[in-house]
């Protein structure tokens, strides 16, 4: 390719650009995976968002992280597949549709199952694509040709296969068990769908009278209404207080049922009174106790949370209404002893947002222990999967150890209907707990099995319940690749490489996937689990619907562009697994952090425009652009690289090395920050500025060409480095830089990621260049502090005893003069500055000098007079020597202006500046009316006479010192107040401390400046 390079538009338009390239990538199937191609596979399956959902900031954060990894590995040459899809979300869909039906005055039961499912599919078709289209706006590099849905035909086949297989192996069973029941959704929920909340409640104490009239026992409970289902009272067999009561009976208040007093080791003698009411149908511990002691199981609740006929006079009342009425009745009858305030934990339904009830119910269960043990074996023997950060391994392991059997049936209609068919002809056309059934992969298979067992006239009815959504989600990593069929996708891309997900679904999803995969495929479903943190709001609070503090990512995309949001979310990650804080002004609908990323995009755009504007006369072929072979820079014959060229190339390869290391180890935030600092700082602020003079038309042709080639080489490398983080703007610039034809299918997304050439990394050169940059920056700062006009040329004197540093300064003197606007630059040997102790500068230095001179002269005269009286001839000698020495001392050290300044500096040492390494050092010896600073061991002095108005500058410095001292004193006062330090938020106190340190530093610097103006 030898096209002449044209330029970019003057302004970057993210909205047009992003839409253009998203369309291009999808239409050209850039991200379509091919299992028949070579290359090490890199596969990620998307954590499927609910089909009901819309994009929230958590989705955007997770998608940005995944896409960064996927794009990086694709550019590394791996055979990459990111597989998209959505989850059918049974409970969420039911919640939405049943609200709609309620508004119409209907229920789903009135509508009927068939009509309800028709409405569900219709709703999915109309609204289900919302989140998919929103994901497209994020520019995610997924293979849309492989998009899956957990209710599609292939996944339904996988679900049936898994269910039947587990049932045949005895790992799925139907049984009566105590389940978590959500009255709001009227469905069982699994343990991991239950959220425990600490609440302020009550502990009620009641008397239960002994049937023989000899007394009573006292029990305590947080759920008084459940006493209507009590079938015993239990005590610990070792509790001497109650041993004599074991075997006796009690008469239950209200119901008048006679119940036994039993002994059980489970009872804690220290809890309450040591007597525990036993309600086997409504408490898990009581359920186990009831089975051990063969107690009756009395269910008092309907599925909607009201009391059933076993509630007697309270039947039909809501559980919480019944609670109040039961307490009132017991108080009236004299059985209420006391009510205590009691803080305790209450289980809530994650979906229904109401307290769940332990309810005795016939459900389908997975026998979880054999599956969990396989996952534990992989973890303990092979550290598979590997968790990043590693601390989540223990959380995952503890969960696997403590699992109990998984209730997988849900009393819903939208979802995978349980593949079990009841022979209702055997139980008078009704499904009962005793109705025989067959389990099959299809209706036809069910009929064949049923006919062989029950005869040709058998009548079948499929189980009305559906499977827990997490059952199908647990199969996601391999069912989406074609399992149970042995497909090319499954062979190439399974097990998948990385799972990126939040810590909050390790229990819901990650453990389920590893158990299912371990059982059905004999492998863990992914090599690495990268656990990310939460996106927190501007006040560092977790974003949630209930807190109403979420930030719509689409709003930020519409305001700043997709790349700006993506880059912000990734850059803010301080370390793997850490939460991020997103700055946001809700009144203005503005995000300073995303705005900063947009500014970064604009900075890159303007830098690219500058580079292209200065590549005239050269073609893409001359520059080696777009060839895919830009790992090393080959300058034209006879073109010598300058010091700046060699420095930027070294820095570029150092950044490649660092970026690759960070991404390979999931340090995405560190990688993003490193690229940012290189582009904004090294490339834009320094290298481009350093080469501007070499790009002039009248510059040396060879030097100009070297600058052009280096600029083009580094710019293309920058675009590749940054592409995984900001894909749209980098694609747009790269297409223009490499002059791709409009109909070309070439894309930056498929270019090779830069590889570091360690031979081009020169740490010594980078250190040397740091000295030049530090010197330029110091001169610029001194100019600004002295208010030297921007266009004014100045004199700068540099002194250092280091021969090597003088050589560096001399080699880079043209850079110093150009960038610091120095007309005359001297570089000379000089003493290295020494560390000093700061003392307060004094005023009236001339007066003080004269007074000291007079005192010294007088003291010497008196000493000589005393000596004359005591030692012959000695007085004359000392009179001559003493008076002569005194005259020399006063003249040399107090009256001569330059010497006076040196003398006073020893007593009234000026405040000092920090050098590059942070050591506080004395300012260099400066000429009168000059300003000075230090960088490393180099002393920088800028004479100001004739450049600025010294008196005006001195007055301004004195005012600034006074203001800074006042601020520092105010902050000291606040920080010395115990009420402020102890009661103010920690971040506010720290901010005050930081402000004080900054104010004191400012005072120190300003005093130094004032001293050099004396």
UniProtKB/Swiss-Prot annotation:
ATP binds at residue 545. GO terms for molecular function: aminoacyl-tRNA deacylase activity; ATP binding; valine-tRNA ligase activity. InterPro entries: aa-tRNA-synth_I_CS, aa-tRNA-synth_Ia, Anticodon_Ia_Val, CAAD_dom, M/V/L/I-tRNA-synth_anticd-bd, Rossmann-like_a/b/a_fold, tRNA-bd_arm, tRNAsynth_Ia_anticodon-bd. A motif ('HIGH' region) lies at residues 49-59. Keywords: Aminoacyl-tRNA synthetase, ATP-binding, Coiled coil, Cytoplasm, Ligase, Nucleotide-binding, Protein biosynthesis. SUPFAM superfamilies: Anticodon-binding domain of a subclass of class I aminoacyl-tRNA synthetases, Nucleotidylyl transferase, tRNA-binding arm, ValRS/IleRS/LeuRS editing domain. It comes from the Bacteria. One of its GO terms (cellular component) is cytosol. Signal peptide: none annotated. It is found in: Cytoplasm. A motif ('KMSKS' region) lies at residues 542-546. GO terms for biological process: valyl-tRNA aminoacylation. Residues 947-1014 form a coiled coil. Belongs to the class-I aminoacyl-tRNA synthetase family. ValS type 1 subfamily. ValRS has two distinct active sites: one for aminoacylation and one for editing. The misactivated threonine is translocated from the active site to the editing site. NCBIfam families: PRK05729.1, valS. Catalyzes the attachment of valine to tRNA(Val). As ValRS can inadvertently accommodate and process structurally similar amino acids such as threonine, to avoid such errors, it has a 'posttransfer' editing activity that hydrolyzes mischarged Thr-tRNA(Val) in a tRNA-dependent manner. This is Valine--tRNA ligase. The gene is valS.
């Amino acid at each position: 390719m030898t096209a002449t390079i044209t330029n970019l538009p003057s302004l970057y338009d993210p909205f047009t650009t992003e839409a253009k390239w998203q369309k291009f990538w999808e239409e050209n199937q850039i991200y379509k995976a091919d299992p028949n191609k070579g290359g090490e596979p890199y596969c990620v399956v998307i954590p499927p968002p609910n089909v009901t959902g819309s994009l929230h900031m958590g989705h955007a954060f997770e998608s940005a992280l995944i896409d960064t990894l996927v794009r990086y590995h694709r550019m590394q040459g791996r055979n990459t597949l990111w597989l998209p899809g959505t989850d059918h979300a049974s409970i969420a869909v039911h919640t939405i549709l049943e609200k709609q039906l309620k508004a119409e005055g209907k229920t789903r039961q009135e509508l009927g199952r068939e009509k309800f499912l028709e409405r569900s599919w219709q709703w999915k078709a109309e609204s289900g694509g919302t989140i998919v289209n929103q994901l497209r706006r994020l520019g995610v590099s997924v293979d849309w040709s492989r998009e899956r849905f957990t209710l599609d035909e292939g996944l339904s086949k996988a679900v049936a296969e898994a269910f039947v297989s587990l049932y045949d192996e005895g790992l799925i069973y139907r049984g009566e068990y105590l389940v978590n029941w959500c009255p709001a959704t009227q469905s069982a929920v699994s343990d991991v769908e239950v959220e425990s909340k600490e609440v302020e409640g009550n502990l009620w104490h009641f008397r239960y009278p002994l049937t023989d009239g000899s007394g009573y026992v006292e029990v305590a409970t947080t759920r008084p209404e459940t006493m209507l289902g009590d079938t015993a009272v239990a005590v610990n067999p070792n509790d001497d207080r109650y041993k004599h009561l074991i075997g006796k009976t009690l008469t239950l208040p209200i119901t008048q049922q006679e119940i036994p007093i039993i002994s059980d080791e489970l009872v804690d003698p220290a809890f309450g009174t040591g007597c525990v009411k036993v309600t086997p149908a409504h408490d898990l511990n009581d359920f186990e106790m009831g089975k051990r002691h063969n107690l009756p199981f009395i269910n008092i609740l309907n599925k909607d949370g009201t009391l059933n006929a076993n509630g007697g006079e309270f039947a039909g009342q809501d559980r919480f209404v019944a609670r109040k009425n039961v307490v009132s009745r017991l108080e009236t009858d004299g059985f209420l002893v006391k009510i205590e305030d009691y803080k305790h934990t209450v289980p809530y339904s994650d979906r229904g947002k109401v307290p769940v009830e332990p309810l005795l119910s016939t459900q389908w269960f997975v026998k979880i222990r054999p599956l969990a043990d396989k996952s534990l074996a992989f973890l303990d023997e092979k550290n598979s999967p590997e968790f990043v950060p590693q601390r989540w391994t223990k959380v995952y392991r503890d969960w696997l150890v403590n699992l109990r059997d998984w209730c997988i049936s849900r009393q819903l209609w939208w979802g995978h209907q349980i593949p079990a068919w009841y022979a209702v002809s055997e139980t008078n056309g009704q499904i009962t707990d005793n109705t025989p059934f067959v389990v099959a992969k299809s209706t036809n298979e069910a009929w064949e099995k049923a006919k062989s067992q029950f005869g040709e006239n058998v009548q079948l009815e499929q189980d009305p319940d559906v499977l827990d959504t997490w059952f199908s989600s647990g199969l996601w990593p391999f069912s989406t690749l074609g399992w149970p069929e042995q497909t090319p996708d499954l062979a190439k891309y399974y097990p998948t490489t990385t799972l990126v997900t939040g810590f909050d679904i390790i229990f819901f999803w990650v453990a389920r996937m590893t158990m299912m995969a371990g059982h059905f495929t004999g492998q863990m479903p992914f090599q690495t689990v990268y656990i990310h943190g939460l996106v927190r709001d501007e006040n560092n609070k977790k974003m949630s619907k209930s807190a109403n503090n979420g930030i719509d990512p689409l709003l930020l995309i519409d305001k700043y562009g997709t790349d700006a949001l993506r880059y912000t979310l990734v850059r803010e990650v301080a370390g793997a697994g850490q939460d991020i804080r997103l700055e946001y002004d809700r009144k203005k609908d503005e995000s300073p952090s995303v705005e900063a990323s947009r500014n970064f995009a604009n900075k890159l755009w303007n830098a690219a425009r500058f580079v292209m504007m200065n590549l005239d006369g050269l073609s893409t072929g001359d520059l080696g652009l777009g060839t895919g072979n830009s790992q090393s820079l080959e300058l034209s014959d006879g073109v010598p690289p300058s010091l700046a060229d060699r420095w930027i190339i070294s820095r570029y390869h150092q950044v490649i090395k660092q970026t690759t290391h960070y991404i390979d180890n999931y340090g995405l935030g560190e990688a993003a920050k490193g690229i940012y600092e290189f582009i904004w700082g090294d490339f834009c602020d320094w290298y481009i500025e350093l080469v501007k003079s070499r790009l002039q038309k009248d510059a040396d042709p060879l030097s100009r060409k070297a600058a052009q080639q280096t600029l083009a080489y580094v710019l293309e490398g920058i675009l590749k480095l940054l592409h995984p983080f900001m894909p749209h703007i980098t694609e747009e610039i790269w297409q223009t830089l490499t002059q791709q034809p409009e109909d070309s299918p070439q894309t930056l997304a498929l270019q090779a990621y830069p590889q570091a050439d360690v031979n081009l990394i020169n740490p010594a050169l980078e250190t040397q260049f740091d000295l030049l940059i530090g010197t330029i920056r110091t001169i610029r700062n001194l100019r600004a502090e002295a208010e030297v006009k921007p266009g004014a040329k100045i004199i700068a004197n540099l002194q250092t005893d280091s021969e090597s540093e003088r050589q560096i300064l001399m080699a880079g003197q043209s850079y110093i003069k150009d960038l610091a606007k120095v007309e005359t630059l001297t570089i000379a040997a000089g003493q290295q500055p020494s560390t000093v102790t700061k003392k307060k500068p004094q005023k009236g230095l001339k007066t003080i000098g004269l007074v000291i001179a007079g005192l010294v002269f007088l003291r010497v005269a008196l000493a000589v007079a005393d000596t004359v009286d005591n030692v012959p001839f000695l007085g004359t000698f000392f009179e001559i020597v003493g008076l002569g020495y005194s005259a020399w001392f006063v003249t040399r050290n107090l009256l001569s202006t330059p010497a006076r300044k040196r003398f006073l500096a020893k007593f009234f040492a000026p405040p000092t500046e920090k050098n590059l390494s942070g050591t506080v050092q004395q300012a260099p010896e400066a000429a009168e009316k000059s300003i000075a600073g230090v960088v490393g061991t180099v002393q920088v002095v800028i004479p100001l006479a004739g450049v600025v108005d010294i008196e005006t500058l001195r007055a301004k410095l004195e005012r600034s010192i006074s203001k800074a001292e006042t601020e520092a004193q105010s902050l000291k006062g606040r920080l010395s107040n115990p009420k402020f330090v102890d009661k103010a938020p920690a971040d506010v106190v720290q901010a005050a401390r930081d402000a004080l340190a900054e104010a004191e530093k400012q005072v120190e610097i300003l005093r130094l400046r004032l001293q050099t103006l004396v």
